[in-house]
UniProtKB/Swiss-Prot annotation:
Function field: Catalyzes the phosphorylation of the hydroxyl group of 4-methyl-5-beta-hydroxyethylthiazole (THZ).
InterPro entries: Hyethyz_kinase, Ribokinase-like
GO molecular function terms listed in the Swiss-Prot or TrEMBL record: ATP binding; hydroxyethylthiazole kinase activity; magnesium ion binding
EC assignment: 2.7.1.50
Gene: thiM1
GO-annotated biological processes: thiamine biosynthetic process; thiamine diphosphate biosynthetic process
Keywords: ATP-binding, Kinase, Magnesium, Metal-binding, Nucleotide-binding, Thiamine biosynthesis, Transferase
Species, as recorded: Clostridium botulinum (strain Kyoto / Type A2)
Gene3D superfamilies: 3.40.1190.20
Binding-site positions, ATP: 118, 164
Family: Belongs to the Thz kinase family.
Protein's name in the database: Hydroxyethylthiazole kinase 1
Amino acid sequence: MENKNVIQKMREKTPLIHCITNYVTINDCANILLSFGASPAMCEAYDEVYDFVSISSALYINLGTLTKEQETAAVLASISAKNHNVPVVIDPVGCPAIKRKVEVINRIAEVGRIDIIKGNIGEIKFLAGMDSETRGVDSLDNGENALDACTQLAKKYNCIVAATGQKDFVSDGKRGSVIKNGTEMLTKVTGAGCMLGALCAATCANFEDKLVSTTAAILSMNIAGEKAYEKAQLPGSFRIALIDNIYMISDKEIWERGNVEWK
């Protein structure tokens, strides 16, 4: 397996992460990227994104509050990413509830590129054509067959797929990881999943093995959450502590403290 200095390599490059994301968590995504050691750019005007992607290190597309203008921008950005060899992370927020989002994902796969799909277990199982339990943008799924769903979807789109829940699952279609770190408090603040998607974009920007980089991003969020909860047991203070601990997280810490089963 490739050397696992994922965070170190990311911080050495300070990658520019182009985010087309939702209005609910745009500030959270920008702040967590800064704390992690990346440089966020929240550029979504459809007449600007093609050029901006060309100078970016990774593109993060979050479908949470998808407008028609964002859809146009996301597709154009993905075309630029394909033309300029920029990795793309897709977060299919709420796709079981709004089928149009699946059409957007398929369009991006057709004309652009997808390197990572990161969603909750319900979203990933839905995209894989499996029965899933969701409510709005939240997953109610118990995680059964989640790794199989990741594997099927990874083969379909030829990309990395990550499904988050009580346990987190990652697959590239052949290899996989199961991550057992985290805290329930991450479900009590809006945007934890969106922030994780941004971290996935940061870690994949300059790291070839994207199964490892995605696993590292999830470990970073989960372990920062565990440490934040040790000092802050209420949602407001926990959110602040989470950002602080992302700032301090290291490769040594995530691989030593991480509870990961490689498949």
